Structure formats: C-alpha cells, structure tokens
C-alpha cells in the first residue's frame, strides 16, 4: 500500500479552515489539474461507503469550504450545489455493504476512491487524498494528507460531495426500511438503530454483516 512519504501524522499547524496552498505547491511544479478525494461512510452499520473526487477551478473557488463534519447539514447541502456548479469536474463512486463485507471497509473505501477518479471527465495531474493511504491503482500520481479535509479545499469539497451523496442515499433507504430510522442516523450505531437490528434483524444488502454487533449473530 502506497503511503505519502512527506506527510507527517503529527500536525500542530492545521489552518483554521482549509485553503488552496497544497494545490498551489503542486501547480508550481507544472501540474495543472489537482483532484481532491475523500470518502464518507466508513463507520456505519448499514449502507455503502461513498467516495468523491473533485477538481476545483483555482479562479473560482467556492467560499466556505470545510471538512464536512464541521458543517451543518443545511450548509453541506448548499455547498454541494455550489461545488457541482463551480468545479471543473466532480465524480462519485460507492461500494455496497455486500462489497464491504466481501473485503473490508478500508479496502472498500480505497477502491471507491479509485473509481471516483476514473469517473472524472478529465484525468487529473495529481490527487490529494484524505487520510494516510493513496488508493492502489490510482490513475494518476497521488499524495495522502492526514486530516486533508481540514487542510485542502479540494479535499474539503470532496468530503462535502461524498457526505451529501451518502446522506441522500440513506434517506431513500430509510423510506424503504422504516423501522431502522436510517434517514435520521445514516446507518450509524445509534441506540435506536441497534435496537431495531435486535428486534427486526439486519437487512441483507443493506447492513454490514462483518460489523459488530451484527457479526457472527445473524445469517446474511
């Protein structure tokens, strides 16, 4: 597994908000189009893992971009629409709960990231990836940035797109499976969700059977 050789996990100088400095450093080397990559949905008991890749226009950066976890749902929704309008290209890919169970969540998240880059309408010169790992088989050179969604606006944009996309998917799943309250917690292990799993059982294709407390207790 490739890891960024230059990025340190010990970050004492995180900016108050992500900026374009990481991208500018790469552009000074003649790399024109820089993609930000992030994912949403590593931890839930249900639903897919969703990854997004975003190439922003350096001359028309959306204002207010930040790590999706530091934004309200309403603000994420608003920024999502702005990103889709202003970005040069945006792509989303997801892997299902069954795919996650067939490998593991880390591999599934990295594979979703790889597929998201493939879906871009232009091939980026370089990718900035949130986390510690560059996805295997990435179609362009990449760098892993620990807490990248708080450092790079491109990664922050990808985090917003991935989060909003996944939340919308879980709202639809909630409508199809009312007892679980998926539209409220997006599949995370809330008390209500765990209680529903105990009373109703997990849903094949929706729940992750390799995740506790489901693992080993229910047949898929």
Curated annotation (Swiss-Prot):
Pfam families: RNase_HII (PF01351). Manganese or magnesium. Binds 1 divalent metal ion per monomer in the absence of substrate. May bind a second metal ion after substrate binding. It is found in: Cytoplasm. Its cofactor is Mn(2+); Mg(2+). GO terms for molecular function: manganese ion binding; RNA binding; RNA-DNA hybrid ribonuclease activity. It comes from the Bacteria. It catalyses: Endonucleolytic cleavage to 5'-phosphomonoester. Gene3D superfamilies: Ribonuclease H-like superfamily/Ribonuclease H. Keywords: Cytoplasm, Endonuclease, Hydrolase, Manganese, Metal-binding, Nuclease. One of its GO terms (biological process) is mismatch repair. GO terms for cellular component: cytoplasm; ribonuclease H2 complex. Residues 32-220 form the RNase H type-2 domain. Its EC number is 3.1.26.4. A divalent metal cation binds at residues 38-39, 130. NCBIfam families: PRK00015.1-3. Endonuclease that specifically degrades the RNA of RNA-DNA hybrids. Belongs to the RNase HII family. This is Ribonuclease HII. It comes from Brucella ovis (strain ATCC 25840 / 63/290 / NCTC 10512).
